[in-house]
């Protein structure tokens, strides 16, 4: 385990050549349009995924295309991935990996440490160790302070995993809050301008902030001085008067809604972004709901079919909220039926309250019953519908601001049965403030009722049950979270509740419970709401994972005890008057936040 895994860089280069040769592009020219300047800025766009999945991750690809498709942007972007040859069968980077030379970009084979800018899209906080491993393999010092003395690239990070940028403040130079297409181009232009003025000058995040005219969505850690007293933040002093950081909203752009290229098999259309519902625990609530016009989406479907694409992903938080969903499904079906080869359609999430008989018939015509996550897993193709009732207790859900009645899902099950869908994946959450065993009994009762409805059809029900991990940027961001022991107890309670209703034998036949991996739960629970001092623990997590060592709760608690934090501070409830590490970007209405916490706290008082 401790022996270095040596890798032949020439083999990696040949693999890069082979996958680029297989790519199918739906726009010309490939990669980038001709640039109007000779002194182009070299950019790397880093995705924490292996190749196939990276081709449908439009978040990072939209940054890549925004730089490359604009003739007036003085930069050219290459992709940086978790290259398949440097990973094991589970797509984890080989332990103790040693390369003959620094890791390079996919297209132009530029060593990562020779780039001018690296843009990173983090889908979640747990992917930070993968990102840091890639940077390290590219010869880049991980700490921002260590890069000040050398000629290293600036690093811009964004995405849902950076909603609390302070946890990564010691690693990255600046953060894009909200959408990043327009801002990333402005940063490229600023670097270009500063380099022309003084080629030897060491450019900092502060320089970029002062050069960009509209910097309202750019968070630069070095511009904020934090004062700590023990584990608490007592003051945040900006470098100069800085308004609250706003969430950037890019205008509708083609490459945020469709794939401009494919791995030769799969392409994506994105009919909508965000969600219309206003649930206090969901990050999608704060992103704003946006829709794409149906016509250009369908035009790209034609291009996909013409190029022989056999998998099309319709990716949205809730496809059924899209106002033109009927037209989209009908036209998709018409085009696929005319194709000379079979095409599999994968749908994103469906809102059970919005499922009508008409929509289900259209989905049935498409045979689009497989959730997107099954595309690059070993998930067997079968009629499976993924729905998110979240919880069985209506009282809990009302307290969280969720207006949907989770028990209405039973009506959707009845409708789905009419078109032959008997297998369901249900997304559920446990561990909310004020939640009791009686509340979890309601979740068990709901799962049992669904199992009853599909039993005679040999239907299966998968319960994907996650603990509440209060997310910065949501109205539940100050809520405490359950311990690993409590989480396991809650899962057992739901399991026993279902068994008591349908019996042991039927439970074995029909029900499976999928939990969040323990290590991921532990890591996310302590870093998600921390401040920049958490970087020392992140580096320890990185060291363990790089060596292939698992992290248990005992080890993690030891690291926390040796830090400036306590376990209770990182995982417990945060008072309403406490200064949040992400205070400068906190856009949550304090009255809404207080209302949710007070409502749930009142439930506790009533129980007493």
Where are these regions (language model features)?
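Radical SAM enzyme core and accessory elements
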Residues: 1-31, 39, 45, 501-608
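Acidic, glycine-rich segments characteristic of secretory precursors and extracytoplasmic regions
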Residues: 2-169, 174
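N-terminal [4Fe-4S]-dependent radical SAM core
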Residues: 11-42, 52, 221-271
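Conserved SAM/AdoMet-binding glycine-rich loop
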Residues: 45-52, 117, 302-425, 430-460
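Canonical Radical SAM [4Fe-4S] cluster-binding loop centered on the CxxxCxxC motif
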Residues: 57, 260-295
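Short secondary-structure boundary/capping segments
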Residues: 60-62, 135, 170-175, 191-192, ...
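Glycine-rich beta-alpha loop elements in corrinoid/cobalamin-binding modules
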Residues: 95-233, 472-531, 538-549, 593
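Segments forming glycine/polar-rich beta-alpha architectures that bind adenosine-containing cofactors
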Residues: 273, 303, 307-308, 341, ...
């Amino acid at each position: 385990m401790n022996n270095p895994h040596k890798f032949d860089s020439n083999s990696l280069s040949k693999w890069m050549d082979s996958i680029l040769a297989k790519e199918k592009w739906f726009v010309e020219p490939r990669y980038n349009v001709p640039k109007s300047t000779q002194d182009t800025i070299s950019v790397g766009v880093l995705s924490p995924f292996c190749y196939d999945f990276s081709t449908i991750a439009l978040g990072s690809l939209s940054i890549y295309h925004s730089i490359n498709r604009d003739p007036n942007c003085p930069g050219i972007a290459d992709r940086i991935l978790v290259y398949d040859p440097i990973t094991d069968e589970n797509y984890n980077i080989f332990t103790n990996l040693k390369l003959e030379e620094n890791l390079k970009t996919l297209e132009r084979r530029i060593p990562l440490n020779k780039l001018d800018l690296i843009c990173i899209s983090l889908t979640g906080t747990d992917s930070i160790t993968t990102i840091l491993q890639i940077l390290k393999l590219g010869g880049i010092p991980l700490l921002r302070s260590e890069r000040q003395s050398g000629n290293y690239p600036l690093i811009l990070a964004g995405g849902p995993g950076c909603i609390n940028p302070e946890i990564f403040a010691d690693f990255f130079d600046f953060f894009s809050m909200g959408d990043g297409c327009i801002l990333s181009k402005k940063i490229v232009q600023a670097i270009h301008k500063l380099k022309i003025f003084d080629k030897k000058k060491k450019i900092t995040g502060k320089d970029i902030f002062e050069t960009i005219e509209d910097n309202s969505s750019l968070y630069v850690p070095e511009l904020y001085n934090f004062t700590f007293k023990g584990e608490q933040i007592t003051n945040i002093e900006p470098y100069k008067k800085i308004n609250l950081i706003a969430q950037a909203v890019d205008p509708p752009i083609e490459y945020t809604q469709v794939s401009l290229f494919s791995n030769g098999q799969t392409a994506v259309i994105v009919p909508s972004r965000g969600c219309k519902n206003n649930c206090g625990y969901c990050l999608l609530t704060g992103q704003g709901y946006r829709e794409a016009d149906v016509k250009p989406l369908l035009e790209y479907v034609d291009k996909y079919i013409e190029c022989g694409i056999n998998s099309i992903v319709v990716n949205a938080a809730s496809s059924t909220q899209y106002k033109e969903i009927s037209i989209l499904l009908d036209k998709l079906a018409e085009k696929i039926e005319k194709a000379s080869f079979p095409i599999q359609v994968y749908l994103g999430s469906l809102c059970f309250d919005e499922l009508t008989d008409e929509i289900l018939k259209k989905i049935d015509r498409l045979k689009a019953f497989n959730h997107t996550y099954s595309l690059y897993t070993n998930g067997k193709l079968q009629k499976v519908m993924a729905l998110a009732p979240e919880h069985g207790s209506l009282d809990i859900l009302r307290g969280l601001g969720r207006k949907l009645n989770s028990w209405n899902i039973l009506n959707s099950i009845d409708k789905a049965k009419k078109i032959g869908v008997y297998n369901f994946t249900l997304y559920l959450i446990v561990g909310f403030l004020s939640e009791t065993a009686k509340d979890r009994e309601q979740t068990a009762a709901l799962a049992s009722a669904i199992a009853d409805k599909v039993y005679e059809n040999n239907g299966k029900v998968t319960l994907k049950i996650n603990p509440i991990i209060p997310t910065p940027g949501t109205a539940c961001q100050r809520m405490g979270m359950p311990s690993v022991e409590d989480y396991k107890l809650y899962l057992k309670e739901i399991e026993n509740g279902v068994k008591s209703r349908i019996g042991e034998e039927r439970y074995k036949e029909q029900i499976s419970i999928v939990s969040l991996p323990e290590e991921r739960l532990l890591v996310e629970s302590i870093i998600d709401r921390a401040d920049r001092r958490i970087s020392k623990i992140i580096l320890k997590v990185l060291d363990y994972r790089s060596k292939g060592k698992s992290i248990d709760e005992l080890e993690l608690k030891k690291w926390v005890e040796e830090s400036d934090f306590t376990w209770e501070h990182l995982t417990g409830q945060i008072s309403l008057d406490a200064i949040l590490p992400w205070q400068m970007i906190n856009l949550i209405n304090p009255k809404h936040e207080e209302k949710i916490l007070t409502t749930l706290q009142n439930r506790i008082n009533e129980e007493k």
